[in-house]
């Protein structure tokens, strides 16, 4: 393992796909343009294109070939192929739990034993393809400038916990996890009663205060610029705010919610199926993110 390999693994775990035939393995990584324009109205795709030079310099020496790039309005894809029997391909498959799509991948336990710098590189790879920084005034109702990094994970419950635990391993607390679960995404059963029974089946969002995410950072230029700007603003506007707290170090807020008819849905992991949750830490703890 090295920092370059860790970064590549993070990109694959975050938004990668692996296709394999009898002789060759093809890996595609999708870098979405979450918003078409940055906060200062610059074209996101231009920033991603500029950042690809840095990403190429990290990955191409590792894989020993040029990355193939393609672009649509909403994302940039990078692709490479190598023979199945090459060591780097066998290692990638092993370390992503043999999943072929990011929605089915899981971090191999070995990844939690790599160096701190390698863990940060892995998280940076994940953040570059799934994360974005958001200027937010909803973390606290009475205060603004509570800016956070959002890492979005569609469908993969166990990857949410893997990412939270990897952040914990480098001493970065999660501020909140917005699970794609009926008790959180349709907490008052309003959408269900409107006939939108599966409205709650949304991506999971891991949220981290911007200043706490600085040790990870982004290789995508516009994301890094926003991270630095919003981190400075958060600290300046809230000098006494204690962002460095894990959920088990502060009181857990539970909100009484009605039972939701979809709490037994087959799409939910077996460990939480049939259970009712009134706080995200209760769910996260049951799946393995805790003290």
What are these language model-derived features?
Residues 1-291:
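Internal intein/HINT superfamily modules and their associated LAGLIDADG
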């Amino acid at each position: 393992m090295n920092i370059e390999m860790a970064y590549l693994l993070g990109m694959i775990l975050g938004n990668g796909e692996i296709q394999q035939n009898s002789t060759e393995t093809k890996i595609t990584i999708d870098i979405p343009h979450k918003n078409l324009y940055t906060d200062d109205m610059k074209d996101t795709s231009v920033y991603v294109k500029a950042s690809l030079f840095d990403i190429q310099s990290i990955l191409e020496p590792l894989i020993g070939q040029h990355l193939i790039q393609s672009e649509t309005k909403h994302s940039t894809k990078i692709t490479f192929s190598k023979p199945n029997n090459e060591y780097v391909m066998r290692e990638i498959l092993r370390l992503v739990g043999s999943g072929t799509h990011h929605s089915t991948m899981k971090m191999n336990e070995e990844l939690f034993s790599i160096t701190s710098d390698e863990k940060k590189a892995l998280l940076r790879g994940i953040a570059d393809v799934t994360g974005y920084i958001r200027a937010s005034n909803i973390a606290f109702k009475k205060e603004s400038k509570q800016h956070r990094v959002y890492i979005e994970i569609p469908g993969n419950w166990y990857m949410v916990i893997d990412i939270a635990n990897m952040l914990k391993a480098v001493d970065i607390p999660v501020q909140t996890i917005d699970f794609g679960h009926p008790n959180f995404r349709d907490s008052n059963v309003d959408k269900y009663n409107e006939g939108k029974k599966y409205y709650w089946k949304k991506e999971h969002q891991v949220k981290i205060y911007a200043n706490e995410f600085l040790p990870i950072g982004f290789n995508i230029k516009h994301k890094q610029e926003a991270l630095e700007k919003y981190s400075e603003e958060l600290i300046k506007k809230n000098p006494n705010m204690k962002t460095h707290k894990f959920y088990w170090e502060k009181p857990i807020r539970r909100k009484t919610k009605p039972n939701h008819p979809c709490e037994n849905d087959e799409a939910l992991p077996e460990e939480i199926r049939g259970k009712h949750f009134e706080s995200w830490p209760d769910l996260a703890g049951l799946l393995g993110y805790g003290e």
